[in-house]
Amino acid sequence: MGRSLKKGPFVAASLLRKIDKLNDKGDKQVVKTWSRASTILPQMVGHTIAVHNGRQHVPVFVSEQMVGHKLGEFAPTRTFRSHSKSDKKARK
């Protein structure tokens, strides 16, 4: 079930404030955030946002195709280590 259109997209207030300040200055600094649930808005395009993945902040450069998606989609939380080869010695 999606979010009500009446409410609008969720964006952390602190993140939105930081992005608006950078847009007013015309500055392009990396913005650090822990808010993975925030929706990417059109005013965020062109900025680099460092999204926390539970261990570190992953830099995400926001492009036009990302608008409407969540920040957490672009910062993977799990690292996949390949499956071990079927080795007879390793099993014993």
Swiss-Prot record:
InterPro entries, per database record: Ribosomal_uS19, Ribosomal_uS19_bac-type, Ribosomal_uS19_CS, Ribosomal_uS19_SF
Molecular functions per Gene Ontology: rRNA binding; structural constituent of ribosome
Keywords: Ribonucleoprotein, Ribosomal protein, RNA-binding, rRNA-binding
GO terms classed as biological process: ribosomal small subunit assembly; translation
Pfam families per record: Ribosomal_S19
Ribosomal protein among keywords: yes
GO CC list: cytoplasm; small ribosomal subunit
Protein function: Protein S19 forms a complex with S13 that binds strongly to the 16S ribosomal RNA.
Family: Belongs to the universal ribosomal protein uS19 family.
Stored HAMAP family: Ribosomal_uS19
Designated name of the protein: Small ribosomal subunit protein uS19
Organism (species): Synechocystis sp. (strain ATCC 27184 / PCC 6803 / Kazusa)
Name of the gene encoding the protein in the UniProt record: rpsS
